């Protein structure tokens, strides 16, 4: 497994960027993952002869000069972060009208993969991983940077077990370019969306704390606190309902594990504190 996803050669077939060299330096080797705003590639840095991850924004986002300036500013800010639990940003630029950002290539898997395979995760192990996430977010917040899109897909676990948070700086640039949540567009993954991003369209440092609390809840219980269709239903619950205690959800859905490895009261209290509206 590699940065953000498994390498599947078939996903690279027909991708026009595979085989290209961005700015005469970054040779695109294969596609790793595709999201709503960008595609992530494995690439070779010809200048420093190393493997990197390159995130290329989709066509159209680079046409707006204001977005290009914000993207550049946010990428530069993210590049200043120095923390072992932050995926390092090496470079950024624009190639053929498409903004891109060059990042550390992490061999491993995402927290989403861990949750899918192992959840409910024992409390001590979950807390150990969340401590690393908190360290990364703390460094960002001290630098004045809010992540805005904390979710399991943006948390990487290396082959050595090191936890790293990816995508600092990108969510803000994209969301500022498109629209605020109050204008009808749900920025970020709705399952982890902080209430204030929905009600005011603005994210603060505690917005990342809220999303981290939701992520910890899912790790502990194997389920998200709010589900439903359409996504606006889940968004409404984030704004109007309190997150249930993880211990109660675990006891109801996985009674055997709740007896073998119960969630302590202080962990319940931590989730409640993180997700307080």
Language model segments and positions:
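Activation-segment/catalytic-loop signature of the eukaryotic protein kinase fold
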Residues: 92
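Protein kinase catalytic-loop region centered on the HRD/HxD motif
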Residues: 133-145
């Amino acid at each position: 497994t590699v940065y953000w996803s498994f390498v599947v050669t078939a996903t690279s077939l027909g991708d026009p960027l595979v085989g290209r060299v961005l700015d005469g330096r970054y040779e695109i080797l294969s596609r790793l993952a595709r999201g709503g705003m960008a595609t992530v590639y494995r690439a070779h840095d010809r200048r420093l002869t190393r493997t990197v991850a390159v995130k290329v924004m989709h066509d159209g986002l680079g046409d707006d000069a204001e977005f290009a300036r914000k993207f550049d500013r946010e990428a530069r800010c993210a590049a200043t972060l120095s923390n072992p639990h932050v995926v390092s940003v090496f470079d950024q630029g624009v190639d053929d009208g498409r903004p891109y950002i060059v990042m550390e290539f992490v061999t491993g898997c995402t927290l989403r993969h861990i949750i899918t395979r192992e959840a409910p995760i024992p409390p001590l192990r979950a807390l150990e991983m969340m401590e690393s996430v908190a360290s990364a977010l703390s460094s960002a917040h001290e630098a004045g940077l809010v992540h805005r899109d904390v979710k399991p897909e943006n948390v990487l676990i290396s082959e050595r077990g090191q936890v790293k948070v990816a995508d600092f700086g990108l969510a803000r640039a994209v969301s500022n370019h498109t629209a605020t949540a109050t204008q009808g567009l749900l920025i970020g993954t709705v399952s982890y969306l902080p209430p204030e991003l929905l009600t005011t369209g603005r994210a603060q440092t505690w917005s990342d704390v809220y999303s981290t609390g939701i992520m910890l809840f899912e790790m502990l219980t194997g389920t998200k606190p709010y589900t439903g269709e359409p996504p606006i239903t889940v968004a409404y619950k984030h704004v109007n309902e309190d997150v249930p205690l993880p211990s109660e959800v675990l006891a109801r859905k996985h009674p055997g594990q709740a007896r073998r490895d119960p969630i302590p009261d202080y962990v319940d209290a931590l989730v409640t504190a993180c997700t307080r509206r």
